[in-house]
């Protein structure tokens, strides 16, 4: 099963910069168990609209069956890990 973490961000978003190191650590520690797709909402407004992103940062964990979890605002590593496990990573 493919597990994806979509990271909706903007270059001007301070909290997004706070979230980045957490996601980088997760990627390193979890290796190939999931993939991260970074979505710059200023450049990819259609994707942001499709996922109804209204605040930043927004993280969406999904698998082949659809969206498993959505987080708005800076999210703790443990919460993201729980969602990744629930999604099958």
Place the predicted regions along the sequence by residue.
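The canonical Cys-X-X-Cys-His
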Residues: 13-16, 59
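Structural microenvironment flanking redox-active thiols in thiol-disulfide oxidoreductases
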Residues: 41-47
């Amino acid at each position: 099963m493919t597990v994806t973490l979509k990271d909706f961000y903007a270059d001007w978003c301070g909290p997004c910069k706070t979230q980045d190191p957490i996601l980088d650590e997760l990627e390193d520690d979890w290796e190939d168990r999931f993939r991260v797709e970074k979505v710059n909402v200023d450049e990819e407004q259609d994707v942001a609209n499709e996922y109804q992103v209204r605040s930043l940062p927004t993280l969406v964990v999904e698998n082949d069956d659809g969206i498993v979890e959505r987080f708005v605002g800076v999210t703790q590593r443990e919460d993201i890990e729980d969602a990744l496990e629930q999604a099958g990573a």
